[in-house]
């Protein structure tokens, strides 16, 4: 799920194509995550029958596997994962297996970046409120009636 607006990247499925592939969504299998020093990985196994309903332009015709899909494209096929995953390879002997990776500390870095952005936004709001209070106070002082001398 996206929390902000972005332009779709890749080739969007038609409503009819999407309906056909989503029939298989509950049968998609997600491996446990595994990692090396830089990345965490997982593989996603699509039902073999699903490959028959995925549009041909999603495939690399030279090797007979799915081509590397954009995040929007693989999400459009019904693959659901948290943010940061990148489709980087297809397993040629088993074309229904898609390999994904993301930086090892992606979620921690995302949380830290989100917290920093929220803190910055709060500081900006506080500064704006202080400026508004100062302006209101200045206007109020300017409007005070001078005491009359009798």
UniProtKB/Swiss-Prot annotation:
Highest taxon of source: Eukaryota
Region annotation (Disordered) ranges: 115-150
Alphabetically ordered keywords of this record: Cell cycle, Cell division
One annotated Gene Ontology cellular component of this protein: nucleus
Pfam families the UniProt entry points to: CKS (PF01111)
Biased composition annotated in UniProt, kind: Low complexity: 115-137
Any GO MF annotation of the entry: protein kinase binding
GO BP: cell division; positive regulation of transcription by RNA polymerase II; regulation of cell cycle G1/S phase transition; regulation of mitotic cell cycle; regulation of transcription by RNA polymerase II
Quaternary assembly: Forms a stable but non-covalent complex with the CDC28 protein and with a cyclin.
PANTHER family in alphabetical order: CYCLIN-DEPENDENT KINASES REGULATORY SUBUNIT/60S RIBOSOME SUBUNIT BIOGENESIS PROTEIN NIP7 (PTHR23415)
Free-text function comment from the UniProt entry: Binds to the catalytic subunit of the cyclin dependent kinase (CDC28) and is essential for its biological function.
Similarity remark: Belongs to the CKS family.
Note from the entry: Present with 8780 molecules/cell in log phase SD medium.
Protein name (Swiss-Prot/TrEMBL): Cyclin-dependent kinases regulatory subunit
Species this protein is from: Saccharomyces cerevisiae (strain ATCC 204508 / S288c) (Baker's yeast)
């Amino acid at each position: 799920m996206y929390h902000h607006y972005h332009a779709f990247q890749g080739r969007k499925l038609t409503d009819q194509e999407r309906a056909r592939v989503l029939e298989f969504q509950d049968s998609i299998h997600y491996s446990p995550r595994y990692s090396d020093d830089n990345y965490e990985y997982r593989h996603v196994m699509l039902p073999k029958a699903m490959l028959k309903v995925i549009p041909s332009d999603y495939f690399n015709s030279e090797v007979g596997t799915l081509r590397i899909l954009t995040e929007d494209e693989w999400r459009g096929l019904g693959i659901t994962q948290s943010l940061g995953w990148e489709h980087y390879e297809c397993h040629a002997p088993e074309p229904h297996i898609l390999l994904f990776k993301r930086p090892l500390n992606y979620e921690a870095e995302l949380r830290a970046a989100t917290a920093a952005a929220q803190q910055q936004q709060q500081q900006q709001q506080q500064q704006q409120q202080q400026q508004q209070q100062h302006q209101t106070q200045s206007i109020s002082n300017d409007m005070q009636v001078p005491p009359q001398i009798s």
